[in-house]
Curated annotation (Swiss-Prot):
Pathway: Aminoacyl-tRNA biosynthesis; selenocysteinyl-tRNA(Sec) biosynthesis; L-seryl-tRNA(Sec) from L-serine and tRNA(Sec): step 1/1. This is Serine--tRNA ligase. It comes from Thermoanaerobacter pseudethanolicus (strain ATCC 33223 / 39E). The keyword Aminoacyl-tRNA synthetase applies. Homodimer. The tRNA molecule binds across the dimer. One of its GO terms (biological process) is selenocysteine biosynthetic process. L-serine binds at residues 230-232, 284, 384. Its EC number is 6.1.1.11. It is found in: Cytoplasm. Coiled coil: none annotated. Gene3D superfamilies: Bira Bifunctional Protein, Domain 2, Serine-tRNA synthetase, tRNA binding domain. One of its GO terms (molecular function) is catalytic activity, acting on a protein. Belongs to the class-II aminoacyl-tRNA synthetase family. Type-1 seryl-tRNA synthetase subfamily. Its main location: cytoplasm.
């Protein structure tokens, strides 16, 4: 959520930023309502002051034994008018809030201008895609042939876009989760959190999923609970309605969770295999920082996520996301894309975002500066560290052998207790 003063003081800049994001918000109506509200509050304050004065006058007349009935009648009319105006102010504020909730975060000045993912800018690559002397298979074929993935059974039990991991497949998924957590905790300094997999509506609002993206969320029937689309939601909301001691910043958290998404509007896009599932595992990175440190922390977070892929020997590239592809809550975002041989292209495996104070305003997360000054909103950052199912898929594709087996990356062997998955 943007600072109202920012919109009020520089509406044209906000309007341009919204257009660059490809979003829509009625800034003119917002400004009209904002001015109306401010005028109404001034008038309301004047009426309340008058009521206070007349109350004193009534009390004085009564003490003097004089008739105060006319003044009492006027006071009743005045009180009714105040009550009516308070209701009008409430209605104006509710409409203001509804518009404010639709206004996206403002892109950082360093974000490239563009309309879609075709305008994202590659900034670096790591590793060389492997050259195969045989035709590489897609990960879903490899997994089914090795009997470590079962899409058909999951479809019978639940439906499409779900998977059973079996045998060494289940062990590989678990090994990846533990490896990622261990790396981020032991080397990068994150504190692990194991969050609830359900949150209520206010938490989804706090991180920006609601009200705009409700159609992409799984709601628990008959309750106010939602299955989390990412651990970013519960971990960020751990600090909702709190003031953090400035000496404790920055705060680093990592969390494993299952994630649940409708993937509305994604029909036909990567629907085979593990790339676009309704339920998937992810290790999430979340940071809370002082405003002047958040972009430095974004670079660190992105490097932390990259190190997972480097340790696994998976080629990848990093792109900075353009304005039109940036999303609702982020001011700046990097995507890390892993090489998938059967696709012949890089596929997103992590997004690392700086939301500045956008989520903090929605969730009311502040910090007390070290000098003891007035509490300010923190900056929040989040990133995948990384998506586990997509990493599983990338390992199957990049480490597949001609005989159908898959070599286990060396860093995972202590977790797996085997070097190769084979028939």
């Amino acid at each position: 959520m943007l600072d109202v003063k920012r919109i009020r003081n520089n509406p044209e800049a906000v309007r341009i930023a919204i257009e660059l994001k490809g979003e829509k918000a009625d800034i003119d109506r917002f400004l009209e309502l904002d001015e109306k509200r401010r005028q109404m509050l001034v008038e309301l304050e004047t009426l309340k002051n008058r009521r206070n004065v007349e109350s004193d006058n009534i009390a004085k007349l009564k003490r003097e034994g004089k008739d105060a009935s006319d003044l009492i009648a006027e006071m009743k009319e005045l009180s009714d008018k105040i009550k009516e105006m308070e209701q009008e102010v409430k209605e104006v504020e509710e409409e203001l809030e509804r518009i404010l909730w639709t206004i996206p975060n403002i892109p950082h000045e360093s974000v490239p201008i563009g309309d879609s993912d075709e305008d994202n800018v590659e900034i670096r690559r790591w590793g060389e895609p492997r050259k195969f002397d045989f035709e590489p298979k897609p990960h879903w074929e490899i997994g089914q042939e090795l009997d470590i993935l079962d899409f058909e059974a999951a479809a019978r039990v639940t439906g499409s876009r779900f998977t059973f991991y079996k045998g060494l497949g289940a062990r590989l998924e678990r090994a990846l989760i533990n490896f990622m957590l261990d790396l981020h905790i032991e080397k990068h300094g994150y504190t692990e959190v194991f969050p609830p997999f359900m949150v209520h509506r206010r938490s989804m609002f706090g991180t920006g999923q609601l009200p705009k993206f409700e159609e992409d969320a799984f709601k628990v029937y008959g309750t106010d609970y939602f299955l989390i689309p990412t651990a970013e939601v519960p971990v960020t909301n751990m600090y909702r309605d709190t003031i953090i001691d400035g000496d404790k910043l920055p705060i680093y958290h990592c969390a494993y969770s299952a994630c649940f998404r409708q993937e509305a509007g994604s029909a036909g896009r990567d629907t085979r295999g593990l790339i676009r599932q309704h339920q998937f595992n992810k290790v999430e990175l979340v940071k809370f920082t002082e405003p002047d440190k958040s972009y430095e922390e974004l670079e660190k977070m992105t490097r932390d996520a990259e190190e997972v892929l480097q340790a696994l020997g998976l080629p990848y590239r990093v792109v900075v996301i353009c304005t039109g592809d940036l999303g609702f809550t982020a001011s700046k975002k990097y995507d890390i894309e892993v090489w998938m041989p059967s696709y012949g292209r890089y596929v997103e495996i992590s997004s690392c975002s700086n939301c500045e104070d956008f989520q903090a305003r929605r969730a009311n997360i502040k910090y007390r500066p070290k000098d003891g000054g007035k509490a300010q909103y923190v900056h929040t950052l989040n990133g995948s560290g990384v998506a586990v199912g997509r990493t599983f898929a990338a390992i199957l594709e990049n480490y597949q052998q001609e005989d159908g087996s898959v070599v286990i990356p060396e860093v995972l062997r202590p977790y797996m207790k085997v070097d190769v998955i084979k028939k």
